[in-house]
Every structure is written in structure tokens, then in C-alpha cells.
Amino acid sequence: MPDYTCERCLKEFSQKSHYDKHMNRKTPCQNNKKTLEKVVENIITNKIEPKKSEITLKNTITETDHASPKIEIATKNGEKTQQIVKGDCIEGMKKIKDDSVDIVICDPPYNIGKDFGNNSDRQKMDDYLVWCDEWIAECIRILKPAGTLYIYGFSEILAFIRVRININVRWIIWHYTNKVTPSLNFWQRTHESILCCYKEKPVFNKDDVREPYTETFLKNAAGKVRKATKGRFSNGEKETTYTAHANGALPRDVIKISALAGGAGKRERVDHPTQKPLELCAKLIKASKNGADTVLVVPFAGSGSECVAAKKHNINFIGYEINEDYVKLCNDRLSEVEVEVEVEVE
């Protein structure tokens, strides 16, 4: 009697009908094949010399040993660690110490067929999610308990990723009004989603990212007294006076910032298909920054926007990028950055 084996989970079936039913089910089976291949690969790797990888540090190519002790990204002798690493982010992050990074901002390929030069952005969804599991696991491992991990994406793709993340998650919307999808026959896309992930109570600098008040609030509510009402959030018999904060309203989870499209992004735009605005990158960094020694990791450096924003705010960062042209683009942009001097208001 012939045996039928699932190439993905390696489960064996004696009857073809059972095998067909297994292969056609909606929920994908566990990918034991890749797990087994990794085990074999690790066994082989431990028997040969450690591999070398190229690192681009301030436009200088050096070599780093994969077997070297885990590194800690920090300010050393008054100098910030600010570098772009040419190489795979998963392998790169494996070298970073556990619980040592304040902010991780991920703008991965969305698996929608974008051209990034030397890598494919079109995989089977199962393979794409398995790959996402790998880099997200490293991001979570290196993240401090009070740190924040941000992941960009379209909602319909991030929904699959979100359920696989085992720490706290909030949804943020980046809403842009100056860019729409070219289709005229369906809902026009005017937003991207951001997963905001954290282990424990995260650092959140609300006063650094306050937003302008709406005209409605300033006209109808500011300075007025509201009497107590019954309900879940009742404050008893107290009355509340609404006052406008000098720096604006508390930040909301819908961020309204223009995309780099048309005239709005002409001065900032570079040759990269998914470049994010510096204003957006800076907002995420300022919201989660944890003092002068803040450490940011950018697994997919791409156009370098997150790294440029980090350098402007004078924090430590490492960005990973596999495309040599984009490594050069990042370093070119970083070479033109002037650090912004922060003035503390007493």
C-alpha cells in the first residue's frame, strides 16, 4: 500500500483521500519541514568555521564574526552608535543582547510585488508569514520591557501577523489624504496600519507628540465647565473644566501626516518605492524615546528615513539593509543630517 506524505508537516497517510483532505484544508498545517531543515543546518553550522558578514559602518566595509559575543548598542566615549549594516536583519539582530533596545521600527516588504532591486516581494502567504515570524521573534527578544516595536503594513496583511505576536499589541492608523490608489473601481486606500507592540508598560512621551486641537474643541469646549454625569467613568459630583494644553491635544491613534506623493513630498522624496515621511518617523521616535541613550533598531532600513530621524534626534541606532544601492542611499542621506539641539523648557 503506497504512503502519502505532506511535504510541509511531514505527516504520513495510508489513504489518498485522507491525504487530499489534509492538503485542501483551509488552515495551513505546521511547517515541520523548515523546522527540521533548520535543526540540520544548525548541526552542520556548529561543525564548521563561523561565517563572516560585511558590515557598512560610516561608509567603511569591515568583517564581523557570527560567533562573537552579543553586542550592546550604546553611547561609547561620548560617541553615539549610528550605523547601517549591509546584510540580513535576522542574522544581524541575533548578535544583539536580549532586552537591550528601546525602539524597533519595521517597514518590511508587504508581499505585494514591489520591486526592491535584488529580492522578491511576492511569496506564498504561508512562506511570508513564516519569514515574518523569524524577524519578529528577534525584534521581541532584543526589545526592552518598556520598549516599543512598530510594524508598518496594510491591514489585510497585518491581521495575519498580529495574531502570531505573543506580546501586547495596539493598532495605529497612518492616515494620508494626498495619495490614493490608482483604481477607480473600489474603495480608495488613504491609510496604512502600524502595529504598536510592547511587553510591559511602555515609555510614552505624550507631551512630545501632542497634536493641534480641533476647531470644534476650541470653539465649543475649551474653558467651559462640564457637570458630572452618571456612567462608567463618572467622577461623582465633581465638575470638570476643559482647559487647552499649551502644546496641543493628547496624541490619537490616527496619525494624519501627508505621504511623500505629488508636490507635498517633492523635496524629501528619494529613489525608493516605500519611503516613509521623516515627520512620521520622528513622531514614533519621540513618542517612545527613553532619554539620551535611547537605542533604535531598524530591521529594514530601505530609504533610511527612520535612521535619518534618529540621527536628527541624536540617539543610537543600527539599520539593516540587504540592497547595496539602498545602503549607499542611507549613508548619503545620513551624511547630510544636522543634529537638532533640544531645548529643555523649565
Where in the sequence are the language-model features?
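C-terminal recognition-helix end and immediately following basic linker
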Residues: 1-40
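Residue-level marker of structural boundaries
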Residues: 25-29, 290, 335-339
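Intrinsically disordered, low-complexity regulatory regions of eukaryotic transcription factors
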Residues: 35-58
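DnaQ-like (DEDDh/DEDDy) 3′-5′ exonuclease domain used for proofreading
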Residues: 55, 59-77
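Core catalytic lobe of class I
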Residues: 73-320, 324-327
